[in-house]
């Protein structure tokens, strides 16, 4: 058995697929590429494929990772070629590397992500004004997002600053704004990109519709002791 770690992308053409639909599409690619993938045992066998995260509907990813267990070693470049030849528009294998079967699961180590959040401005504004408002957030020790759960009928308060460890930056492109934000997932969980966007709109006067935003994840790492490592670097 060989465990192959792949860096892949879920481009804009697939951004509105749910995670389950995206995973199903990837399984079809693996089948069509005729790879010797391993299956679980039992009454309902399934491919031994695992993703680093479950991307939300509407979120594209220039960088995502998946592990696939193969019955035998196949040349990485051959896997890449075969999968890309059978891939739908919006999906591609970028690179790959074999890892130890004792390596930690991707979901256990992928805890730091960079996103590009984009949406239309609701008013004309200079970039330096945006940056001054963002500076207030960047220097704040606390920025609380209130998350209401209809299921429990309770409101949970999340200090977004526990998860946004680096300054958010902005770029204005015509009537649109692009925010670059890095989000850390700690023991208590993480915040969603949409929640950061909403917080900035409602509490820090960033002139955007708090509900109108598209997100693209542009990087994914394992953050350990203040250092970011690629998921290929992990043992």
Question: Each predicted region: which residue ranges?
Answer:
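Short beta-strand-to-loop capping motifs
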Residues: 8, 68-74, 117-123, 181-185
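Extended, well-folded interaction surfaces typified by the phenylalanyl-tRNA synthetase beta subunit core
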Residues: 2, 7-9, 13, 17, ...
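Ordered, soluble secondary-structure elements with a strong preference for glycine-centered loop motifs
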Residues: 15-20, 73-78, 124-128, 187-191
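Short amphipathic alpha-helices in soluble, non-transmembrane regions
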Residues: 78-87, 128-140, 196-197
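Core RNA-modification/binding signature centered on pseudouridine synthases
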Residues: 139-235
